[in-house]
């Protein structure tokens, strides 16, 4: 009986030690998790402050009079709030520049997404002899500097008669967006299970039906990512617009910024008002499609 009693005591002590060890490990892991989350939160907060500070500076100073920045300081709230800067920007043809940019970016994005989808599908879903070569060529095209092509594109648009028109901007915008878009969309389409296509083929779908009914709808997140990423780049593009457009009535929004800067070289609040109105559409699009943007970027990075 003594031996049995001692054995029971040893087993109880062993169980208590195991429970204590598990509890200590749980506490340590919980502390480590809290520390990791705290560090991540601090870095995220720093990133948020660094990101929002320029926008806050731009926004509040766009509501000042011409020399109030020197008198009140750049990070103090305006006193009083001066709305005439926005009235002057709007009355000096801002929306004309704005809608021309919308047309150019909209048409360019539609063409770019259509071509990218048709190019990425065979590269991602079909095995043919030239597949690796074509894919490598497209990837290599991403390294071509945009400014190297300014003079050839200028001569080309002049020769074919579209220089100084919005049509001259659409071709370069689409061409320089395609390599990166095909690269990302190919990686995204490779993550789609092949069983989906196989089951559709069993039901009688051919290649075209597979693409339009299965692959394309499942690629909406990737297409949304490309639309936002390239849309921001096209919206802010200055080099081609400045080279290929000379008539003031045909200029897009980035050129309008230069024009307002030239007309109001000392009136900084008016320039900041133009910048504020220019970035609002892109911020709005990102807020609306941020879930699809993150999903598309993560899916494209999983497998390629």
Positions of PLM-derived features:
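Short, Lys/Arg-rich, polar N-terminal cytosolic tail immediately upstream
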Residues: 1-31
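A structural signal for multi-pass alpha-helical bundles of membrane permease subunits
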Residues: 28-32, 36-304
């Amino acid at each position: 009986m003594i031996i049995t009693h001692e054995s029971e005591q040893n087993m109880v002590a062993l169980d208590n030690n195991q429970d204590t060890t598990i509890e200590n490990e749980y506490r340590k892991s919980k502390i480590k998790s809290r520390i990791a989350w705290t560090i991540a939160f601090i870095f995220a907060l720093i990133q948020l402050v660094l990101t929002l500070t320029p926008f806050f500076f731009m926004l509040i100073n766009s509501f000042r009079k011409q020399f109030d920045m020197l008198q009140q300081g750049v990070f103090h709230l305006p006193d009083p709030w001066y709305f005439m800067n926005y009235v002057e920007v709007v009355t000096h043809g801002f929306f004309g520049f704005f809608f021309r940019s919308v047309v150019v970016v909209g048409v360019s994005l539609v063409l770019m997404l259509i071509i990218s989808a048709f190019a990425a599908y065979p590269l991602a879903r079909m095995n043919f002899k030239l597949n690796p070569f074509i894919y490598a060529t497209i990837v290599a095209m991403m390294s071509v500097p945009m400014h190297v092509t300014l003079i050839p594109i200028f001569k080309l648009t002049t020769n074919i008669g579209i220089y100084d028109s919005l049509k001259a901007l659409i071709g370069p915008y689409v061409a320089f967006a395609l390599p990166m878009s095909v690269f990302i969309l190919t990686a995204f389409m490779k993550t789609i299970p092949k069983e989906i296509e196989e089951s559709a083929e069993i039901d009688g779908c051919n290649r075209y039906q597979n693409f339009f009914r299965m692959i394309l709808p499942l690629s909406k997140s990737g297409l949304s990512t490309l639309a936002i990423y390239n849309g921001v780049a096209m919206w802010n593009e200055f080099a081609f617009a400045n080279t290929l457009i000379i008539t003031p009535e045909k200029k897009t929004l980035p050129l309008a910024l230069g024009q307002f800067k030239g007309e109001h070289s000392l009136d900084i609040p008016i320039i900041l008002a133009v910048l504020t109105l220019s970035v609002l559409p892109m911020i709005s699009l990102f807020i609306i499609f941020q879930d699809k943007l993150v999903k598309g970027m993560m899916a494209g990075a999983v497998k390629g």
